[in-house]
Amino acid sequence: QNRNLFRGSETFMIKFRGAYEVISGLQAGYANNNYTEFGVESSINFPNFLFPFVSSDFKRKIRATTEFGLQYNYQMRPEFLRTMASASWSYKWTQRQKIQHRIDLINIAFLYLPRISERFKEDYINKGQNDIFQYNYQDRLIINMGYSYNYNSVGGAIVNNTIASNSYSIRFNFESAGNIMYALSKMTGIRKNANNEYAILGIPYAQYIK
């Protein structure tokens, strides 16, 4: 971690992780019983609000931090080979020491499965008993944005290490994915694929609100 990357109090962080395991109890039909995973996660945090065409006065008032992030994850299992890559852009700021805001301006993630064993397809995916389960084992593009609000009545007491009685907190989260892409697909007359899904460059994209 570097806390002054460009001499402006920026914070750069990078993490690596890995795992290896021999899976026992697998049924016949799989090439091996090895599980390997590794990943890397990096982010850079700027102590100010970065956005084009925004006045300096607005940036001073909001006092937000800006974070850009990149992630990559690789999973090789007997059942499948799966990779995930993502890039994100977000803002965070605190209001009156009690309220925390976070805006995920955009997060783009790509889930890719170049290999799924035939045994795994037959035993789980092709049975069609769980649509969500099938969804998690398909190539997918996820473009989402979101907002979170966190109110803590203790506020500054946490900073000052004092004890507050009858404290409470309120949390609110909103996340939306694919709805803008869906509207553009409808407007431009893009046809759905064989699975009745809209796609970008042949890759289906996720659509939800939560």
Spell out what each predicted region is.
Residues 2-11, 33-35:
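Membrane-proximal, glycine/serine-rich, low-complexity loop/turn segments characteristic
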